[in-house]
UniProtKB/Swiss-Prot annotation:
This is FAD synthase. The keyword Ribosomal protein does not apply. It catalyses: FMN + ATP + H(+) = FAD + diphosphate. NCBIfam families: cyt_tran_rel. The keyword Chloroplast does not apply. Homodimer.
Length: 151
């Protein structure tokens, strides 16, 4: 899955991981990923599977298309789809040093760090604050605006 993306033996790179649904990709996503990349040398992104999105409406954009769009962003070294069964599964292969959470992601940083350590993945968890306000920096806001204009 990640062949060709590991550094050579002896290289010490800081690997950052970000996760998310990234439905209807917008500037807020791009700002978040740029800030996450600034925490290290490599940025890996796990895209939530359609079947795993249960805390909000199902994505409008199918997972494969969301994966393609995020993987094409300049800040992203590699994007992959998450596991449908175990959210920690891809982390075992990526082996992140830092996990970047968005300001609105529902994880508790301390609990997540404990769960990671328990699974032999001692990554530091960092919450990225809301960095830039913009009128259409949320998927929900974009959908509401589209409905207002065309609904």
């Amino acid at each position: 899955m990640l062949a060709g993306y590991y550094p050579s033996p002896g290289d010490l790179l800081t690997r950052v991981l970000a996760t998310g649904t990234f439905d209807i990709l917008h500037p807020g996503h791009v700002y978040f990923l740029a800030q996450a990349k600034a925490l290290g040398d490599e940025l890996f992104v796990i895209i939530a599977r359609d079947s795993n999105v249960t805390h909000k409406p199902k994505p409008v954009i199918p997972e494969e298309q969301r994966l393609e769009m995020v993987d094409a962003l300049k800040a992203v070294n590699k994007a992959i789809l998450g596991s449908e069964k175990d959210m920690f599964e891809p982390l075992r292969e990526i082996k992140p040093d830092i996990i970047a959470l968005g300001y609105d992601q529902r994880f508790d940083t301390e609990i997540l760090e404990k769960e990671l350590t328990k699974r032999g993945l001692p990554a530091k968890v960092v919450r990225i604050p809301l960095s830039k306000e913009c009128p259409l920096c949320s998927t929900g806001t974009i959908i509401k605006e589209v409905l207002k204009r065309y609904g």
